Amino acid sequence: MTLGASLNIDPKVLAGVLNTSSARCWSSDTYNPYPGVMENVPSARGYTGGFSADLMLKDLGLAVDSARLSKHPVLMGALAQQLYQLMSSKGEGQKDFSAIIKLYQTFL
């Protein structure tokens, strides 16, 4: 979504294309994190409500710790944990976990 926006593609149009192709997934057709694409999701309410980033961080910690104990690498899980830790340290942990897109946008 962020790439599309940087190419001046309307987010609603891009979501429509994604959702009628093999790119369709839960985060694009049910819980889109990009503001203005869907109604009745946290991104339409300033990322209020929903499942908090702090709870996502807790769950990722449990998953990464379990993987470490069983000696299974979870590279992307560990990276996600670090990103949610950064989000939480910036005081954004009470927001819905989909607000991670705002953190991602700061890296661009």
What residue ranges belong to the model's regions?
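Helical "substrate-binding/catalytic lid" subdomain
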Residues: 1-108
